[in-house]
Amino acid sequence: MNKKLNEVLLKLDQDLIKCVKGSLDLEISGVTYSSKLVLPRFVFFALPGIHFDGHDFIEIAIQKGSNVVVCSRDVDFYSPNVTYIKVDDFNIRKFMSNFSNIFYDEPSKKLKVIGVTGTDGKSSVCYYIYLLFKKKGVKVGFISTVFFDDGSGSLIKNPYRQSTPESTEIHSFLSTMVKNEAQYAILESTSHGLDLETARLIDVNYFAVVFTNIGHEHLEFHGTIQNYLNVKLGLFRSVSDDAGFGVINLDDLYSSDFKNAVKKSFTYSLKSSKADFFVSFIDEKTDSTRFEFYHKGVKYLANVSLLGSFNVENVMAALILVSQILNIDIQDIVDKLNCIKSLDGRMDSINLGQNFSVIIDYAHTPGAFSKLFPIFKRFATNRLISVFGSAGERDVEKRFLQGQIADIYSDLIILCDEDPRGENSMCIIKDIAKGIVNKVENKDLFFIADRKQAIEKAISLAKAGDLVVALGKGHESSIIYKNREVFWNEQEVVKNAILSLEKSEKEK
């Protein structure tokens, strides 16, 4: 895609631009904030950051062919034939989003964009909506923590560490969806992505939105639960189309706030018959869940190959969204729920014939812990052994809560790394341990920072009928430390630990 720089700038808020040095009569062919991704005639945004400053990479970007640099401070050397656009630090991400949106011809206006937000369940709800659309033969694109689909029908793993990519990638991906003739786009809309400070989603035109729940997460970024809530409410307030609507979990404490933030909404509940969709009965099996729900006085019977009442909530959100946006009969969607399957790293059972069970799950919040641990306890015919950590440079307050919940249900706990980043691993572990009051260190509570060794310890301690749960990583392919990122595959680590145990037992 090629555009004239001046044509793009004419459509932007001129008040955001402090000054321009160089020609505006330039052809540009792309937009990026990463010097690694720069190609000839790319606009390079020098974003300030916590660990890296884009201004330090301006020369590299120019060497690779960038002919336009957007910066928030004066640079040491101005290259001829390069245009420099200066904006405020605070506005540079907003300007990048505005610029990307215009450069890619406002792609979200050519799609019906569905945003899913909440503390827990976002990725699963996005995936279930995607699967139901596909089952109905609808062309759809998809951006989530785990998977992407650019509208071509092919799922790829999310290539970014962020659930919601930067605005340059969002609008580029939406543009590709338009080219691939997708009708709908599903966006996992995180609080980081929705926040005005990151400005990743501010130029996305949403048609329908889903709210799952609010819990204790990301307060290191938002400061207070009210700020966190307001960011998510902003998504609902952004729905301007008269035909647009919201889908809301009525069981959440903040559901009324979300109802008030959107003109039209549909609610679902596992507790209240006042909801538009009320789940009145749930029967959990070891490999599936059967449930019934009512809508406008009509009873529907459904069955899914998923575990847990929390997944019934997720399925209901997807079912309502798809039936309403496509304006089709509820029973039509109920009949197609057999297409729904578990997302990678969610309630992922590892069975190599061992006499104990192992489940891997991405759960990393107190809310997710409170929903999953009762299920784990029911599944464990003997002891429950839990392996988990908590993210470094993230919400510190949740660590105590994670430990507290795990302590109630677990027989043994092994604390380890999740993503320590720049924090000391043992400091994080001890923060979690403050919530664990019913365990004794080195008896039924172990501190093993190395996650591989922690999992191996759990597997070595497992006896017949035990359930080992490894939480917090799920599908993720790396562990982040201060100055390095280490490849990680939880499934392979667990499998290797089981095989090593079996080998050592045979050699005895």
UniProtKB/Swiss-Prot annotation:
Q: Where does ATP bind?
A: G118, T119, D120, G121, K122, S123, S124
* Localization of this protein: Cytoplasm
Q: Give the record's keywords alphabetically.
A: ATP-binding, Cell cycle, Cell division, Cell shape, Cell wall biogenesis/degradation, Cytoplasm, Ligase, Nucleotide-binding, Peptidoglycan synthesis
Q: What is its EC number?
A: 6.3.2.-
Keyword Hydrolase attached = no
The GO terms this record gives for MF are: acid-amino acid ligase activity; ATP binding; magnesium ion binding
Pathway membership, UniProt? Cell wall biogenesis; peptidoglycan biosynthesis
- PTM (free text): Carboxylation is probably crucial for Mg(2+) binding and, consequently, for the gamma-phosphate positioning of ATP.
Residues that, per the record, bind UDP-N-acetyl-alpha-D-muramoyl-L-alanyl-D-glutamate? S35, S163, T164, T190, R200
Biological processes annotated in GO:
cell division; cell wall organization; peptidoglycan biosynthetic process; regulation of cell shape
Can you list the disulfide-bonded cysteine pairs?
Answer: none
- Top EC group: ligase
A GO CC annotation recorded here is: cytoplasm
Q: Which residues carry this modification: N6-carboxylysine?
A: K232
Record-linked InterPro entries: Mur-like_cat_sf (IPR036565), Mur_ligase_C (IPR004101), Mur_ligase_C_dom_sf (IPR036615), Mur_ligase_cen (IPR013221), Mur_ligase_N (IPR000713), MurE/MurF_N (IPR035911), UDP-N-AcMur-Glu-dNH2Pim_ligase (IPR005761)
Which superkingdom, per the lineage?
Answer: Bacteria
- Function of the molecule: Catalyzes the addition of an amino acid to the nucleotide precursor UDP-N-acetylmuramoyl-L-alanyl-D-glutamate (UMAG) in the biosynthesis of bacterial cell-wall peptidoglycan.
- Family per record: Belongs to the MurCDEF family. MurE subfamily.
Please give the name of this protein: UDP-N-acetylmuramyl-tripeptide synthetase
The species this protein belongs to is Borreliella burgdorferi (strain ATCC 35210 / DSM 4680 / CIP 102532 / B31)
> Gene name, please?
murE
